[in-house]
Structure formats: structure tokens, C-alpha cells
């Protein structure tokens, strides 16, 4: 059924298709129909960050930026759902067109630019949702906030989403907000992590529960840079790392239509880069911090490869666009088939 739906949706522009799909998934969730459209994955419970996940396959941030279809995505069988990226104030993002499909490579290029309706709108939607599973909320900075003031934006968002999130992801790796990726390095990263850790402690006291913080990083780092990031995460007491966001590289899509468009590349071509980052992180973190792997999962075996590389959880986005809900169950099954010692 999804193959037919995809053929129809792919006749529309990528952003129109995205918006329509989100509307349909949201409507299906409100009516309780989405569970009928896909076979639920087997139970494969896992405990990560002190949270209990029914299975280790989640929805990556970016597909549902405003929390418009939380219940709908949950009914498709995801073990957890991450929404956002959300910013303190609503913003339109970059000019259209800003999403480009590369179907021959099972890839997508986007330069959305954190288009969203603002954190207050997202919180109201989370409050209205029926979903009571693991919900991640991904936070970022507004386009017009200077990088040197970025910490303020992250703290504003953290304050507002804390009571509503199972965990919070700090996005410092989107390539579509100027200067954002500089926050992954050196003193900028240390200052951000320190501020977040202090605020997390304050909010834990205020709300009576500790909400884990995850940092989402880019795949375009050297091994040396990745090692330094790992050290900073351990030192600051962060709870998890998500590896990875989209890449600026065009390796694997050279010469394809739209390959020269600006933006972050996701999907199959980023798989090896992302998995390499997971391996480097796993070697450096040595189990002290869980890894959530994202990037290039278009088949179940790719999810298993991420777990084998050292991840505790995986997330899908572009693969979901190309393969539909069946990829969730396929990924859970592939992970379940791994020897227990390997997962």
C-alpha cells in the first residue's frame, strides 16, 4: 500500500508531499487508524538514559517539527518519537524550494532552516497529544540569534519543554543555520554544555524529575574532533549523544539531479559516515554514555549495523520517506535477530 502512496506523493513537490503526509498521519492518529495500516513490530524492550523503550527504533527529529502528528507516528510502531527542531520564536525558515529528492540514491537534500511555529505552540500540541511513550523534543536557536547568544535560546527552550519531554535533544549540528555547527567545538561547546547541565540541575529540583539531555552532532568531523566532543560530553555530564545529523558532503550523489543544491544530505549516502562516527564515539565513550544512531538506515540490516557499531537506539527519517512504516518493523526484527551479546 505504501508503494502506491509513495508514487502518488512523489508526483508532488517534496515539501507539499511532506506537509500532506504529516496531515494524513496526524488525522490517522486522531482516528486511531494508523495501527491498521502497518503491522506492529515485535516487542524488544530496552532501557536507555533511565527510560524504558518498547523497541529501539525511533523517529528522528525534523519530520514532525511542531508536534502535529505525535499520536499518528506512535501508532505506526515507533519505539520512541522525537519532535522538533523547535526554537524560542516562530520562524519561517529558508526560502522555498528547500527540499530535494534524489530517489536514485535514496537520499534527500534539505535546507529548511528550522522552520517551526515556536516552542509555545509545540508545548500546546504535546499537551493535547494522547501519547504517553518516550517523547524526545529537539531544541535549537533562532536564525537571527547571534551565535554568541545561542545559549540563551537553548535555555529558553529547555525551560519550556522540560516538563513535557522524556528527553531533550540539543541540536548543534544542522548545516542550515549559519554558525550553528561552531557550537560543536572547543570552548563554545564546553560553555554550552556547562550552562545546560546547570539548568538541568535546577529544573530537576523544580520538577522533581531528571530529564536526560542528548547532544546531536554532525557526521562531518574528523576522528580527532569526535574524540574531543566525546570528552566534553563526559565531562559535562550529558546523558546521550545522537550521531548523526545530515552531511555537507556530496559523496555518493555526484552528478545526480539536485546534487548541487545547498543543504544537508540525508539518506543512504550518509550511512557509512554516520556509522563511522558511532564507532569512534563508542570506542571513546566506552559505555559511559549511550549513543543514538541516525543516518542512512534504509533497510533493517542497516539498523542492526548501527547497534553492532555501538549504538543503543536508532532513529529513521529519510528511510521512512522512501520505505514507509514497514521499515520500522524490519529494523526491529533485524536488531532482534542479532546475538544478544551484540546488542
From Swiss-Prot:
Gene Ontology CC annotation, any one: cytoplasm
Subunit structure: Monomer.
Keyword Oxidoreductase among UniProt keywords: yes
Localization per record: Cell membrane
Active-site residues per Swiss-Prot or TrEMBL entry: 174 (nucleophile)
Keywords, alphabetical: Cell membrane, Flavoprotein, FMN, Membrane, Oxidoreductase, Pyrimidine biosynthesis
Residues binding substrate, per UniProt: 65, 110-114, 171, 176, 245-246
Main location: membrane
GO molecular function: dihydroorotate dehydrogenase (quinone) activity
Gene transcribed to yield this protein: pyrD
Family note: Belongs to the dihydroorotate dehydrogenase family. Type 2 subfamily.
Membrane topology: Peripheral membrane protein
Source organism per UniProt: Pseudomonas syringae pv. syringae (strain B728a)
InterPro entries reported for this sequence: Aldolase_TIM (IPR013785), DHO_dehydrogenase (IPR050074), Dihydroorotate_DH_1_2 (IPR012135), Dihydroorotate_DH_2 (IPR005719), Dihydroorotate_DH_cat (IPR005720), Dihydroorotate_DH_CS (IPR001295)
Cofactor(s) it depends on: FMN
Pathway recorded for this protein: Pyrimidine metabolism; UMP biosynthesis via de novo pathway; orotate from (S)-dihydroorotate (quinone route): step 1/1
Transmembrane segments: none
Protein's UniProt name: Dihydroorotate dehydrogenase (quinone)
Single biological process term from Gene Ontology: 'de novo' pyrimidine nucleobase biosynthetic process
Pfam families: DHO_dh
CDD domains named in the record: DHOD_2_like (cd04738)
SUPFAM superfamilies membership: FMN-linked oxidoreductases
Record NCBIfam families: PRK05286.1-1 (NF003644), PRK05286.1-2 (NF003645), PRK05286.1-4 (NF003646), PRK05286.2-5 (NF003652), pyrD_sub2 (TIGR01036)
Amino-acid positions noted as binding FMN in the UniProt annotation, renumbered to this chain: 61-65, 85, 138, 171, 216, 244, 267, 296, 317-318
Cofactor note: Binds 1 FMN per subunit.
Catalyzed reactions per annotation: (S)-dihydroorotate + a quinone = orotate + a quinol
